[in-house]
């Protein structure tokens, strides 16, 4: 797996040092955090990949894709669960791992580094299991705002989530204060 390109800062999404270090250093962990970010508190969703790594011993997409589905589901559902719907999300994690393994040679960063077209990046993210248009745009905004993945026209291709200074999504979370501002925005 590749490393994140143009790393700008250490991410502070999970509000947990170990989980945030993993999100900052492992792009597949970051993608899985985004996958888990639904019907579950944002910081707990982004702490999920650290739980998977601790319990499974690896975040290698090929190993996760090849894991026994029942055992992997048990690992994700064991309290404290990786997600509120741990067993269901285990299947999605494995499905995303399979796509990364098969379509991107196991290197998740190829989703965004093998093209300069921001619309193509969004399209590739949207095609991942468990990702719709909104989730794809939020993750692309996160890549752009916090990790420096900013091909020409990226803000226009992504839309409102890419707006400078916005507090709409996880793409805007850099500390506890911004996390609360995003929460307040979502409640409004």
Residue ranges of each PLM-predicted region?
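Alpha-helical ds-nucleic-acid-binding substructure associated with the helix-hairpin-helix region
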Residues: 52, 56-127
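C-terminal accessory module of base-excision DNA glycosylases/AP lyases that mediates lesion recognition
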Residues: 2-20, 25, 118-126, 133-188
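Short, aromatic/basic-rich helix-turn unit that serves as a nucleic-acid recognition element
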Residues: 31-35
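Structural motif
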Residues: 18-29, 39-41, 83-88
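Short alpha-helix boundary/capping elements
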Residues: 39-44, 57, 101, 147-148
């Amino acid at each position: 797996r590749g490393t994140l390109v143009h790393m700008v800062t250490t991410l502070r999404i999970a509000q947990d040092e170990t989980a945030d270090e993993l999100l900052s250093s492992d792009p597949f962990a970051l993608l899985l955090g985004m996958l888990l970010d639904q019907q579950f508190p944002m910081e707990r969703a982004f702490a999920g990949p650290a739980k998977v790594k601790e319990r499974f011993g690896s975040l290698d997409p090929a190993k996760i894709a090849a894991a026994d589905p029942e055992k992997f589901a048990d690992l994700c559902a064991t309290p404290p669960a990786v997600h509120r719907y741990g067993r269901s999300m285990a299947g999605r994690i494995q499905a995303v791992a399979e796509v990364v393994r098969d379509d991107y040679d196991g290197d998740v960063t190829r989703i965004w580094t093998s093209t300069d077209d921001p619309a193509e990046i969004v399209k590739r993210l949207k095609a991942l299991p468990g990702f719709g248009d909104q989730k794809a745009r939020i993750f692309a905004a996160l890549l752009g705002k916090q990790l420096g993945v900013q091909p020409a026209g990226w803000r226009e291709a992504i839309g409102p989530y890419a707006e400078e200074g916005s507090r709409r999504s996880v793409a805007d979370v850099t500390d506890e204060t911004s996390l609360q501002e995003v929460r307040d925005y979502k409640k409004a």
